Amino acid sequence: MVANYASMMYHNGSNILGYGVLRLLQYNEQLMSGWESTMKDDIGYWRRFVHDFYTEKGTFRYNIDYKDSPNQEPKLFELSYAALPRFLYLSYCGKLKKMSFLLGNTKEFAIPNNGYFVESSRASILYQYQGGVQVIVSGHLRAHFFRAPLLKLDSLEFSAVGHSEYLLRELMTNASLALSQSRPPQNQIQHDGVKSEDPSSESVNINSSSSLLPDSPVNEYGLEPHIMRFMEITETISGMRDLIAFTLAQRSGPTSALHKFATALQQQHQMQKSTSSNIPYANPAPSGFNGSPRNGDVASLASNYRYAKQPPTMPANAISQANRLLDQNNIPNMDPSILPQSMPIASVPPYSLQGIKRQGTHSPMVEGENPNNNPNFYSSDMLNAQKRTKV
């Protein structure tokens, strides 16, 4: 098999395709051998296994979404690098004899940094249990390998869409034979020449045949109950990772750390909210604007542009105050074309320009002058109140 895959390799840029599939086959081979007596109860073996095939940030995601069973809600489990050895150890501590991946329609892609992405759209996980029970979970597999320096799994994801449970033919034959030998003579009652079977005998036969077959080791999701429980607990602990790290850093009790953690989250949320509120917007709408400036303030230029069809009315004292602030004799660069015709010039709020010369810019009123050559182009009395200028 290795030779066949080696012959399929070809050079594509800086990466040679085929290494990702080979590494996945090595992973599958060592995963199947976990039931051996020397490794079954050794969690150290699984720690070495995870260290050899996963990066320190590697994860295993198991998604369950049965389209044919709408009553079963979708589930998503994510196992981190630290939880993977315990997961594999518990899997083989039960009735499981062998666990392996079956790949179908496998594709491999080279990614930057000498990595590989392997995808199998018709993949399956094969579980073989003691007693002759076999469970096949079908789904979709995605594997992302990262070279560090050997190829290791940065993420392994399996999306289950259904499962099937199988029994050995030998078990079915033995159960049928035992049932036929233990069956009492047919309890038939004859009434007027018509034979009728006892209805209770059919239910007894069904119960007897079910008792002779081994029990199902998996639940409705195709997982063993204790493995399902472990994955649920791990998912909960993974969501509390920040709280656990905060508790260890504070060296306080659970209750005190929980209150401090909630306070820290609130402060962080308030800081983010205040930071986002200080970001200027291009055309903000004034709060409480109903057609006139609030509290007699001078309307902003952005508000005038936004409500140009209905220019705001201004009190007389505001207009006189604006007239005192704006001395039109000191604004030679004023271009009234940028203002709405229906809005008085006095309603434009003052703003000041920074005393920085604009390189290569000419005044629209004096075309021939260059501000770099004329030191009096921006006089000190012109920097108090300026109008917007078209350039």
Curated annotation (Swiss-Prot):
MF term (GO), any: transcription coregulator activity
GO terms for cellular component: cytoplasm; nucleus; transcription regulator complex
Task: State where the protein is found.
Answer: Nucleus
Keyword annotations of the record: Cell adhesion, Nucleus, Transcription, Transcription regulation
**Region of interest (Disordered), ranges:** 180-217, 366-391
Which stretches are tagged as biased composition: Low complexity? 201-211
For this chain, the family text in UniProt reads: Belongs to the adn1/SEU family.
Q: What is this protein called?
A: Adhesion defective protein 1
Q: Which organism is it from?
A: Schizosaccharomyces pombe (strain 972 / ATCC 24843)
